[in-house]
Curated annotation (Swiss-Prot):
Catalyzed reactions: [protein]-peptidylproline (omega=180) = [protein]-peptidylproline (omega=0)
Modified residues (Phosphotyrosine): 184
Protein name: Peptidyl-prolyl cis-trans isomerase
Gene: FPR3
Subunit annotation: Interacts with NOP53.
Keyword Acetylation assigned: yes
Short name of one Pfam family: FKBP_C
Molecular function terms from GO: macrolide binding; peptidyl-prolyl cis-trans isomerase activity
Further remark: Present with 9490 molecules/cell in log phase SD medium.
Similarity comment: Belongs to the FKBP-type PPIase family. FKBP3/4 subfamily.
Ranges of compositional bias, category Basic and acidic residues: 261-296
Length: 411
């Protein structure tokens, strides 16, 4: 019986002369009965010892046997003809036949019942001799078993519901529910975007709007330039016509050539100015920063105790956070692969006393020196985070990255 795993406690109270099924139909689980105990309170004044019997349906019994087996039509016809011939003789022996027939029918019914059910005595208990008896009886749901007690005392059976290798698997629905719960509790997806993603999308939208404005201004400037060019050409043609109408004094060829060259130079100068203006417009209102300026504005990294790396993104105002100060923080915590495992971006800020061991050691070291309004990235090696300890969403030996902002401080 070592393969039968106990699942729950089993108990059954069998009152005298009342058959009780061993297994309830609502719980079709194999039971193992290990003890039978006598109830010392008698139901009558006879005080007879109680005998526990087990009644089991015969697995080899079939309804066809109960009904008389298979029938053959030819045999039925022959029997009917024989019955007609013997009908007269049966009438003569009517009085004697009825009595014998009733006795034979009762005997047949008793025999049929005996064939259908098997009854065995398990034990007999008495308050004068023996109160209890140990058993080792295993009953499966497929067996139709009942208990009955004869005597003056009830008998209580106890044992365990057990897991039998041939039982129908239980808890299929529960397993499906557990799978659904795992799906909903799993952290393979994140419905809320990171703040960095939101800020990046907003900046992209602003860049797109600026590009559209620049393009619109370029188109307008080009239209204005075309209109200006057409107006200048019309003015030049009118001036030339006027000059042709007016009587001019005779000029030398050198003077005409010089004037023509001056006009050409003026046209070229105008075109150069327009091209330069358009070029500046395309480049934007500010000149591109040099590498030195870009490096100057790039956040500088510092390596602190235990290899903790900090990058100040925004320098706050006021005094710096020191040991013992109560600080309120906003933060986003990420694993090395960028997956967010925890964050506080709204509601009540996360507050703790700096340097008092209320948070992981990496925070006590990394937050020190910040001012209110300051933003910082803290990269914490595993020994200064949770080390070998695995938490929900955080594997063991994980390097953690926190983007933090100091929103309040009280010394």
């Amino acid at each position: 019986m070592s393969d039968l795993l106990p699942l729950a406690t089993y108990s059954l109270n069998v009152e005298p002369y009342t058959p009780v099924p061993a297994i309830d139909v609502t719980m079709p689980i194999t039971v193992r009965i290990t003890m039978a105990a006598l109830n010392p309170e008698a139901i009558d004044e006879e005080n007879k010892p109680s005998t526990l019997r087990i009644i089991k349906r015969n697995p080899d019994f079939e309804d066809d046997d109960f009904l008389g087996g298979d029938f053959d039509e030819d045999e039925i016809d022959e029997e009917s003809s024989e019955e007609e011939e013997e009908e007269k003789t049966q009438k003569k022996k009517k009085s004697k036949g009825k009595k014998a027939e009733s006795e034979s029918e009762d005997d047949e019914e008793d025999d049929d019942e005996d064939d259908e059910f098997q009854e065995s005595v398990l034990l007999t208990l008495s308050p004068e001799a023996q109160y209890q008896q140990s058993l080792d009886l295993t009953i499966t749901p497929e067996e139709e078993v009942q208990f009955i007690v004869t005597g003056s005392y009830a008998i209580s059976l106890s044992g365990n519901y057990v897991k039998h290798p041939f039982d129908t698997p239980m808890g299929v629905e529960g397993e499906d529910e557990d799978e659904d719960a795992d799906i909903y509790d799993s952290e393979d997806y994140d419905l809320t975007p990171d703040e960095d993603e939101i800020i990046g999308d907003d900046m992209d939208d602003l860049d797109d709007e600026e590009e559209e404005e620049v393009r619109i201004e370029e188109v307008q400037e080009e239209d204005e330039e075309d209109n200006d060019g057409e107006e200048e050409q019309e003015e030049e043609e009118e001036e030339e016509q006027k000059e042709e109408v007016k009587p001019e004094p005779k000029k030398s060829k050198k003077e005409k050539k010089r004037k023509h060259e001056e006009k050409e130079e003026e046209k070229k100068a105008k075109k150069v100015k327009k091209v330069e203006f358009k070029k500046d417009l395309e480049e934007g209102p500010t000149k591109p920063k040099s590498k030195k300026e870009q490096d100057k504005h790039k956040p500088k990294s510092k390596v602190l105790e235990g290899g903790i790396v900090i990058e100040d993104r925004t320098i706050g105002d006021g005094p710096q956070a020191k040991r013992g100060a109560r600080v309120g923080m906003r933060y986003i915590g990420k694993l090395k692969n960028g997956k967010v495992f925890d964050k506080n971006t709204s509601g009540k800020p996360f507050a703790f006393k700096l340097g008092r061991g209320e948070v992981i050691k990496g925070w006590d070291i990394g937050v020190a020196g910040m001012s209110v309004g300051g933003e910082r990235r803290i990269i914490i090696p595993a020994p200064y985070a949770y080390g070998k300890q695995a938490l929900p969403g955080i594997p063991a030996n994980s390097e953690l990255t926190f983007d933090v902002k100091l929103v309040s401080m009280k010394n």
